[in-house]
Regions:
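Long, charged, mostly alpha-helical binding arms that flank functional sites
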Residues: 254-317, 327, 437, 444-468, ...
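Active-site cavity-forming subdomains of large catalytic enzyme subunits
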Residues: 46-267, 271-272, 301-306, 357, ...
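Acidic/polar, glycine-rich intrinsically disordered N-terminal extensions of enzymes
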Residues: 1-47, 51, 178-179, 203-207, ...
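Flexible, glycine/charged-enriched surface loops at secondary-structure junctions
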Residues: 14-19, 76-79, 118-125, 218-220, ...
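Internal maturation/activation junctions in enzymes
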Residues: 20-27, 31, 190, 280-306, ...
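Catalytic alpha/beta core of large soluble enzyme barrels
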Residues: 239-251, 291, 295-296, 381-540, ...
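Conserved alpha/beta enzyme-core scaffolds, especially Rossmann-like or related mixed alpha/beta domains
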Residues: 1, 43-44, 80, 115-131, ...
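Secondary-structure capping and boundary motifs in well-ordered enzyme cores
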Residues: 15, 42, 56-60, 95, ...
């Protein structure tokens, strides 16, 4: 598979050999669509699509049709519903609109009908703005109980687009006595204020839903659009929403369905590949070739996606193995040393990627959006979840998040296997404590080693699990690397089920204050078993939510 994908998207045989060697050394991994579809006729090598729902009968039905094709060719979809008029608003025929949610219900069924490839059903995340009159109901659409069953969308994921005005209102409401936290819900068609609610009440409901179901995802609209390339701002382009895994932040409109192809470097081996000058440039070239393949081969039903890919040629080079690198080098996640290395890593990746896209602009031509003719690719970096790719890469840590356990039982079709943290195993071996009993204790303690007397306090710091780490450090690291990430990051947060509500609020406020662009899942307990998605949407303890496999890479 490595050879097939490398050959399909390389410039020449030498480039293909280098890509194969990099993947064989586990220095990087192709995204699932690139690895699965490269060199075949099965589907497209694109991970993510973002489309915009127009406020018209034609716009909505066109959205359904486009979703069918995008999903069938293997991509996860994020759709923006913020422009669709709300329930009760007049239509062009003089009747009253049923609102956006019943139309989302159709997409909910559509995703069951259209599969990605052979085995996986379609995956879709609907996004709605925090000012939309239906946002209160939208927060609950994934809960199977309460409300009209015909307005529930339990097969979809969902995200809320939040502006600075809302977050500033929440900040003032929690710091100023008697502050009026009135929040206007405005119909996007008529611009009429449909309802006035308490911003704090809406915020509490949003956080409560994240604790109970892991969602909605959050996109901080102003931070995202402030970071849009100047040449796209001059064209009036705007990012309305994110994707299924919250790492893609590309402009969409009536003409553009955003496209992004992904693959990820393995930071666990940063010390090795950072010494190879051609490594990052080779990956940028490969991803640009993936885009070119899509532009040339996508069917006519994907015209909006082809147009967007042609105009901006955005790619998403991501990363995994961040925590594994720290453990390999005995660096605690919660440390200045980890912060320094984090900055060094992503500065290196961005500099090399930027150098290569400028070289490609000279060699192949700049993307049409760039009227200054400086870059081939409008966006270069995006950090995807990487759950599957991290397993392929020797069970390295997924994406930029901490390990959720130092030992867990992984369930596969072949049976159940005990997965151990290899660096912890090496440490225990050096202490003569690499025994079955010790590992059974670790599993019994949900993957934690804090109870082991054989480890020093410093060693326990290095092997803290995700839920044991102060979540502010996840935000700090994400904020520091965001400077180098053109798009966004799949940032997961981890809390115990009995988390203090003030702490939950403060971490989310910190994410906004530190200019993070998006937040992905809120996971309410450290994982003690492998990805085994529960069909139950609401649960007291969330072990694992479903990641979009298309975004793996």
């Amino acid at each position: 598979a490595f050879a097939r994908a490398a050959e399909a998207f390389a410039d020449d045989d030498d480039h293909a050999q280098r890509l194969y060697d990099y993947a064989s050394k586990l220095w990087f991994m192709f995204s699932t669509p690139v690895l699965s579809n490269g060199g075949t006729q099965r589907g497209m090598p694109i991970s993510c699509f973002l489309n915009y729902v127009e406020d018209s009968r034609e716009g909505i039905t066109d959205h359904y049709t486009e979703n069918a094709y995008l999903s069938s060719f293997g991509g996860g979809i994020g759709g923006s519903w913020s422009a669709v008029r709300s329930q009760g608003t007049s239509t062009s025929k003089g009747s009253e609109s049923t609102g956006a949610i019943p139309f989302m219900k159709v997409v909910d069924s559509e995703m069951l009908a259209f599969s990605q490839g052979v085995t996986r059903r379609g995956s879709y995340a609907g996004y709605m703005h925090i000012t939309h009159p239906e946002v209160e109901e939208f927060l609950d659409i994934r809960k199977p109980t309460g409300g009209d069953v015909n307005r529930k969308c339990t097969n979809l994921h969902h995200g809320v687009v939040i502006n600075d005005k809302f977050m500033e209102t929440i900040h003032r409401a929690t710091h100023e006595q008697n502050f009026d936290d009135s929040w206007e819900l405005i119909d996007p068609h008529s611009n009429e204020v449909k309802k006035v609610v308490s911003a704090r009440t809406l915020w509490v409901k949003l956080l409560q839903n994240r604790m109970e179901t892991g969602e909605p995802y959050l996109m901080f609209e102003d931070a995202v659009n402030a970071d849009l390339p100047d040449f796209q701002k001059r064209k009036g382009l705007y990012v309305n929403h994110s994707n299924l895994c919250s790492e893609i932040t590309l402009a969409t409109n009536e003409e553009r369905t955003a496209v992004c192809c992904l693959s990820s470097v393995n930071l666990e081996y940063f010390d090795e590949w950072s010494k190879v000058p051609a490594f990052i440039p080779d990956l940028v070239r490969m991803l640009d070739n993936v885009l070119e393949y899509f532009i040339e081969n996508a069917p006519s039903q994907m015209e909006k996606a082809k147009y967007s890919a042609l105009r901006e040629r955005s790619i998403g080079l991501g990363a995994m193995g961040f925590h594994a690198y720290m453990q390999r080098n005995n660096i605690p996640f919660e440390s200045i040393m980890a912060a320094s290395k984090n900055y060094e890593m992503f500065k290196h990746i961005k500099q090399d990627a930027l150098w290569e896209t400028r070289r490609l602009a000279v060699e192949r031509g700049a993307c049409p959006d760039d009227d200054s003719c400086e870059v081939r690719n409008a966006h270069l970096l995006a950090i995807a979840p990487n759950a599957s790719s991290s397993i392929i890469c020797g069970n390295t840590s997924p994406s930029i998040e901490p390990f959720r356990a130092n030992a867990f039982t992984q369930k596969t079709k072949s049976g159940s296997f005990l997965q151990k943290n290899k660096y912890l195993e090496q440490l225990l071996e050096s202490k003569g404590a690499n025994t079955d009993n010790v590992w059974k204790e670790i599993v019994a303690n949900k993957g934690s080693v804090q109870h082991l007397d054989i480890l020093t306090p410093e060693e326990k710091e290095v092997f803290k699990t995700a839920v044991e780490i102060n979540q502010s450090w996840i935000i700090e690291h994400a904020s520091m690397r965001q400077e180098f990430i053109c798009q966004s990051q799949s940032v997961n947060l981890f809390f115990p089920p009995d988390v203090n509500k003030g702490d939950l609020h403060n971490v989310h406020m910190l994410a906004w204050a530190k200019n993070l662009k998006t937040l992905y899942y809120l996971r309410s307990e450290a994982i003690s078993r492998a990805d085994n998605v529960s069909s139950q949407v609401k649960r007291e303890i969330i072990f694992e939510q479903e990641d979009c496999l298309a975004c793996e890479g």
